[in-house]
Regions:
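Amphipathic alpha-helical dimerization/coiled-coil segments
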Residues: 2-6, 28, 76-110
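Short, hydrophobic-biased segments on the C-terminal half of alpha helices
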Residues: 52-53
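Glycine-centered, phosphate/nucleic-acid-interacting loop/turn motifs that mediate DNA/RNA or nucleotide
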Residues: 59
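Short beta-strand "wing" residues that participate in macromolecule-binding interfaces
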Residues: 63
Length: 110
């Protein structure tokens, strides 16, 4: 993939309110298990996974697998474009749901 394609993929990943919400959520809470995000964001697993993959492929997220669980976080370090995009996203008026930690209580079903 050339530089233009990478840039366009990154930009297009931000054209969805759900993905903006996911970025704000992970920016606030840090590394989070998919099951906790699913419960906190009230989203079915397949829809959440699709959005997480788009953000990961666009270079915004990293995944850390622990056994059968997948934990996502904002990739660090981000390049200048992604850092500035995340800074702008922080100023958007988006209600960030409370983190529900099913993975810590053993209630995670994923």
């Amino acid at each position: 993939m050339n530089g233009m394609e990478v840039f366009l993929k990154s930009v297009s990943s931000l054209n969805d309110e759900t993905r903006i919400l996911i970025l704000r959520f992970l920016d606030k809470y840090g590394e989070t298990c998919v099951c906790d995000m699913q419960e906190s964001l009230d989203m079915i697993q397949s829809r959440l996974s699709r959005h997480l993959k788009i953000l990961k492929d666009a270079g915004f997220l990293r995944v850390n697998r622990k056994g059968t669980w997948a934990y996502y976080s904002i990739r660090s370090p981000l390049d200048r474009f992604r850092t500035e995009a995340l800074e702008e996203i922080r100023y958007l008026d988006v209600e960030i749901p409370e983190l529900k930690q099913l993975s810590q209580t053993g209630e995670c079903k994923i």
